[in-house]
Every structure is written in structure tokens, then in C-alpha cells.
């Protein structure tokens, strides 16, 4: 795909395309970006699977166990950062914004119903993510006593409403870095940054 990396509107379209593609394309490195939140004064990062992107609302969605550390962190501080990089495309996308946790509501129910059974099993285990254990085999998915639908009570979605999107493209003749920033009313400002 040939595009003009000197055109900010084309860059924003490209970023939206790569994020949308990352939802279903498991080979895309934007399918599994790094999500960072704050745990007190410490940065806490993890790789998560991108489940949805709605460019018009500037929202991306991930799934999580409601009992996890990241959910507790985001309840205490909604600030969040997302970064993905694909070395083949020489492209980095970074988002910053605020997280919203959906648990036992219409949004989480819809996402749960659209999830595959293998994904649901992750939320059906006895203890939440990051719980210490001496017997990891107790959490293997081949267990016969897991009731998959019981996992819904532990399932939540994390929606990230981003107010900045930064796009970096690496090229031999000169890199391009552009930042898009939306104010509280949704008005877009964009500017070039030195890479």
C-alpha cells in the first residue's frame, strides 16, 4: 500500500486501518499491543488482545478478568497508555486516554456472548489472574469441572477512550512522527513531532 507519509489525514486513516485490522488479524502486531497503567507510583504493563476499535468514538476494547490487578489499578487511576509496533511495517502507534471498566452490564454481556468458548474458560477458573498458586496444573483448560458460563461473573471489558494518537513511521530518507490530539469537545488538533 503506497501512501503519503507527509499527509496527516492519510496518516490518521492508516492508523485507524491498522487498529481495525488488528482486531481480527492475528498476524498483525497491533492485535496484541502493550497496555500500561499505574499501580500507585509504579508503571504496570502487559500485552493484551485488541477486541474492538471504533474510530468515530476514539475507543478501543480489551477483555479482562474482573479480579485482576489491572482492573483494580484502573479503578484507582483511569489513566492508560497503549503502544503497538510492527517492525515489518516500520510503524508504531501510541494512544493515551482513560479506561472504563464494564462489568455485568450490557456492554460486557454483549462481548461475553460474542466470545469463543475457549476464551470464556479463562474466566471460569476458581481464582483470578495473578493469584499465587503452588499447583498451576489446577488451572489447565482440559479440566472437566469448569462451567464455562459461570465465568461471566468474572469477565469484564476495558474500554479505552483515547484523546491522543501518535503515529511513527521509520524510513531511510527520514522518519515521520505525527500526533493527533482531541480536546474535551472532540475537536482535533494535529502536529508533526521530531522523531
Predicted regions mapped to residue ranges:
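A short, aromatic/hydrophobic, helix- or strand-capping loop or linear motif
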Residues: 26-28, 85-86, 124-125
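Short, surface-exposed beta-edge/turn micro-motifs
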Residues: 32, 58, 77-79, 154-157, ...
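Short glycine/proline-enriched turns and hinge-like loops at secondary-structure junctions
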Residues: 28, 73-76, 171-173
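An N-terminal domain-cap segment
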Residues: 2-57, 61, 72
